[in-house]
Amino acid sequence: MAQDEPQPPPEVPGPPIEKRPEAPVRVPDRRATQGQTMRGHAKYQRDGDTPLALAGRVIGSRWRALRERFNRDFMNRTLHIGVSARIFHPEPGARGLLSKNLQYLEESIAQWVMSRDVLVFRIPTVNTNGLLHPSNITLRHYARHLDGLVLQGGADVAPQTYSEVPTRPEWSGDRARDVYELELLHEFVDVGKPVLGVCRGCQLINVAFGGTLYQDVVTNVPDALAHVQDIYDAHRHAIRFPAGSSLGKMFHGVERPIVNSIHHQAVKELGRDIRVEAYSEPDGIVEAIRYERADFVMGLQWHPEFHRAGGVELLDCTPVLDEFLRAARETRL
């Protein structure tokens, strides 16, 4: 090594490192563990018990606890509510997306139902005999797996559905949607699930049980109020609840309820076991109905989902939604 190369500095000894004694390994006291187990079993112990009887009692108690916990969790599970589809039928010569059959829901109805923290599912039409996409899924599967059904508004109910012919071509309605929603409605009723119909849905409930409709209120009831105008949901009128109606109980104290009005058809002859829940004022057009042989199957002729945006003078229909969801929750019992 060259003499002019720098040398490393000498190491300076540090303070001595004190060695810590190793922590003793703790061995679990088997007697203590056995004691805890015995004390746990003691609450199930009875005089003269055999080991088999004691084991059966312990297993039975724990099974009941698990079942109660499952029931609590199931009842607290978020409700799953189905909404029927509106259907767009393409016109001849349409191109692109408008050349396809479309199924959709109006945003406000979904948001109104979800305002009570439930999950909303649009229910499509089904075709078990389809050539392209055959399926074994039926509308009954939806009725079994969902907790309730909302029937949307939309196109007219076809007069053929209540054994009439349309008096004008533009009142022909949507027969395909009628068939789909009637099956859907009956499937939910058959399994005891609640149904809430809005506008067209109200009319469909009446028709489903043998009722009929006015094809056009202005034509068929000349003295009636105008129930539809170009201002759409801004058009409104008063309603009244007949004595003993469930809506009258829900809205006890509301002196002059106001609702929107967006319909030119209306309930005419009531179906079997259908009772009137509300009339329009002063013309007496049916505005709400209820099917008496089910816990909750109700139709509202107005659109409750538009009321919040329409102003404070419109009837707050949250009690109706809450009653519908109560019935949905109770079907789990």
Where are the model-predicted features located?
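N-terminal beta1-alpha1 cap of cysteine-dependent amidohydrolase-like domains
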Residues: 2-194, 207, 214, 218-251, ...
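Gly/Ala-rich beta-loop-alpha elbow adjacent to hydrolase catalytic centers
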Residues: 197, 201, 206, 210
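Active-site-proximal beta-strand elements of phosphoester/diester hydrolases
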Residues: 298-301
